[in-house]
Amino acid sequence: MSRAVRPIILAIGGHDPTGGAGIQADIETIGQLGGQAVTIPTAITLQNSHQVVGFEPVAAHLLSQQGRMLLEEFPIAAIKIGMVANVENCEAIQALLRPHPEIPLLIDPVLA
């Protein structure tokens, strides 16, 4: 008996150290819905479960490199974008996704 292949969802967003939001919450949600998550962090947030006091963006070139590696290896079924930490990351994400218009995209902006 063969196992069903789980759809692979690329989650792009911030790292919430409490797991209540960001890519940690995306991983949990995607798994509960039967998918497999692969992730690209856009920022490390400075927070606890009561407050966010700041964030540090991930360098755009690192985001781009990680994205290319994941898109080359995995058959991405959909992409979810959450927190985009700065303009440079927004441009890197746009360049990364431009060659893949066939992949469904969900945008859930956190900071605008």
Located regions from the model:
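Conserved beta-alpha-beta core of the PfkB/ribokinase-like small-molecule kinase fold
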Residues: 78-81, 85-112
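Small-residue (G/A/S/T)-rich helix-start motifs and N-terminal tracts that mark the onset
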Residues: 1-78
